[in-house]
């Protein structure tokens, strides 16, 4: 079952060991994995040089009160894989990233779609995997007063400092439940490493989530790739046959040979939507950080072209602007 972290004082030594362990990993990664890191992130660094010299683009007229009394399901796209989901009286925040950079490499191109101070109290925050653009310790520190619970994938707790909220680890196909809100870990195609050299022992630390409350079901894909012949999305669709909305990544698109097993582009995202048998899909994970060969707007324009090919309407694939809040199911 999932594990819960307590605040007992007799665990101080264990917490210190975890911090020292994480620090050791960082140092080893810098020493032993620098060449690999340079090769895999060279374009991110190059595309970030100009971004680092300027502030993220400002967003006008941000929502200051996202709490809706007229909805069953509403979503506000904060940007990247950060989504504020309201299901009736529950609020879920996915992969919260509010910092300007991730891992000091990828620079935010545009501000988050809502100010942290304007977030509602969050019933549960979800971390899909340990990569820096999804697990941001600085962002967790920023939102700490707002969050009641944090769920991380298997093997993820070692990287979570001691916050005031409860932090729990959830294994594949296990379900966390509180006050009628159910969160189930479901499989995706990705990897779970955080510092490069830890990939050999972090082979389970990535997940998608099924969120269920009051008869509404939402799928959050985190980061995932797609490969022809895989059955895991169909399996998820069979186990959860009434998915109202699926959040799926549509970037980076390029280079496809490198990305295809780890990141879906628009074409593969539509395939996953169909295999999940989801009623609607909301694209995410694009045009946020300087971290790929994609040009701004490319992912969205490609998705719209695929929607035309597949005869999918704007009601079936919902593309949000940053900071936009969409009522998916009204009350």
Q: Positions of the model-derived regions?
A:
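Active-site metal-binding loops of divalent metal-dependent hydrolases
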Residues: 96-99, 130, 188-189, 222-224, ...
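Active-site-proximal beta-strand elements of phosphoester/diester hydrolases
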Residues: 74-77, 91-95, 182-188, 217-223
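Cap/insert and terminal regions of metallo-dependent hydrolase folds
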Residues: 37-39, 124, 149-151, 155-158, ...
């Amino acid at each position: 079952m999932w594990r819960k972290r307590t605040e007992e004082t007799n665990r101080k030594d264990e917490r210190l060991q975890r911090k020292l362990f994480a620090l050791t990993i960082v140092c080893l990664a810098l020493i032993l994995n620098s060449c690999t890191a340079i090769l895999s992130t060279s374009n991110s660094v190059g595309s970030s040089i100009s971004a680092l010299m300027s502030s993220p683009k400002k967003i006008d007229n941000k929502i200051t009160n996202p709490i809706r009394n007229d909805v069953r399901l509403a979503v506000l796209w904060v940007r990247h894989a950060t989504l504020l989901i309201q299901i009736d009286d529950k609020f879920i925040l996915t992969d919260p990233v509010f910092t300007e950079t991730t891992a000091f490499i990828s620079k935010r191109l545009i501000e988050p779609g809502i100010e942290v101070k304007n977030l509602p109290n969050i019933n549960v925050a979800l971390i899909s995997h340990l990569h820096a653009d999804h697990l941001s310790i600085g962002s967790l520190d920023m939102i700490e007063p707002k969050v009641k619970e944090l769920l991380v994938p298997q093997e993820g707790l070692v990287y979570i400092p001691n916050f005031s909220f409860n932090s729990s680890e959830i294994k594949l196909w296990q379900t966390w439940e509180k006050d009628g809100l159910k969160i189930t870990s479901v499989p995706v195609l990705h990897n779970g490493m955080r510092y490069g050299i830890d990939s050999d022992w972090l082979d389970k630390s990535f997940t998608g989530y099924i969120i269920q409350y009051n008869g509404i079901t939402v799928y959050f894909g985190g980061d995932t790739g797609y490969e022809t012949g895989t059955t895991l999305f169909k399996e998820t669709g069979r186990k959860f046959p009434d998915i109202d909305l699926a959040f799926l990544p549509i970037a980076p698109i390029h280079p496809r040979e490198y990305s295809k097993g780890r990141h879906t582009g628009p074409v593969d995202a539509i395939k996953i939507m169909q295999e999940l048998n989801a009623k609607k899909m909301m694209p995410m994970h694009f045009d946020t950080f300087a971290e790929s060969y994609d040009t701004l707007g490319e992912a969205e324009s490609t998705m719209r072209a695929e929607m035309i090919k597949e005869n999918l309407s704007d009601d079936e694939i919902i593309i949000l602007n940053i900071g936009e809040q969409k009522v998916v199911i009204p009350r």
